[in-house]
């Protein structure tokens, strides 16, 4: 599904304008610019890691829906179930760059243990100035113990994507009282090189991922049939533009909505 089609489903589920929902669904699918096959979805198509990343970018309410509801919808639309980061990573063998820890350059050693402190020492300002962006790179490790988890944000796509949340640069006040810009990608690149010795591409990270049928949509058709039946709407996934104003009669209780979102 393309972002506009996810947004049509959102409008049918929640009401409101299709355009309200396009930005979030587009953000989920941006990883395809970095990798042209379905493995790109491992970057964000998860109800744990992907949802946490979107919380850094979008408000809690979008249109008539909660951000979390839309994230869950998107993952189920594409995968047919609530895929987690481990759903993807469990299909990977661990490549050499994730098995062998190399000693980083001396100038980057601090980024392994206390990245916010190391960033402040490198660019000025205080550690708290860098805490939020360092937390972004730690998100995969909060939901997965897989050796590849840190690389799911510390790759070229994840580093570029950080600008969605933090903009192109942080504004830092140095100890001398002067202000300076620190490009947010510089922070991610230092973290990545300290950890892996080089800047990985998203393809590097998922190169060993086995292609499973669920990744290419084997569970989607059954999920959609169930969701349409639960919603009482055969047109829930139609690509036609009608039926967007009927959402008010669709959702009665939160538990019913949960069934429709999650199959």
Residue ranges of model-derived segments:
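N-terminal membrane-targeting hydrophobic helices
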Residues: 1-263
């Amino acid at each position: 599904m393309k972002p506009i089609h996810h947004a049509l489903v959102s409008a049918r589920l929640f009401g409101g304008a299709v355009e309200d929902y396009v930005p979030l669904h587009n953000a989920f699918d941006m990883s395809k610019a970095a990798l042209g096959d379905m493995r790109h979805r491992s970057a964000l198509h998860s109800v744990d890691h992907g949802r946490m990343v979107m919380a850094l970018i979008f408000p809690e309410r979008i249109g008539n829906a909660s951000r979390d509801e839309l994230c869950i919808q998107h993952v189920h639309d594409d995968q047919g179930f609530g895929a987690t980061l481990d759903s993807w990573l469990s299909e990977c063998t661990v490549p050499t760059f994730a098995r062998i820890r190399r000693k980083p350059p001396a100038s980057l050693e601090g980024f392994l243990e206390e990245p916010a402190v190391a960033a402040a020492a490198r660019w000025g300002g205080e550690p708290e100035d860098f805490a939020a962006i360092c937390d972004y790179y730690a998100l995969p490790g909060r939901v997965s113990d897989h050796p590849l988890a840190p690389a799911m944000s510390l790759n070229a796509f994840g580093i570029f994507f950080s600008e969605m949340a933090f903009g192109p640069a942080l504004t830092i006040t140095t100890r001398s009282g002067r202000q300076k810009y620190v490009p947010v990608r510089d922070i991610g690149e230092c973290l990545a090189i300290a950890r892996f010795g080089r800047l990985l591409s998203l393809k590097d990270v998922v190169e060993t991922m086995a292609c499973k049928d669920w990744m290419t949509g084997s569970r989607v058709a059954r999920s959609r049939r169930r969701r349409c039946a639960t919603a009482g709407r055969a047109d829930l996934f139609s690509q036609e533009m009608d039926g967007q104003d009927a959402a008010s009669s669709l959702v009665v209780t939160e538990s019913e909505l949960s069934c429709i979102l999650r199959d």
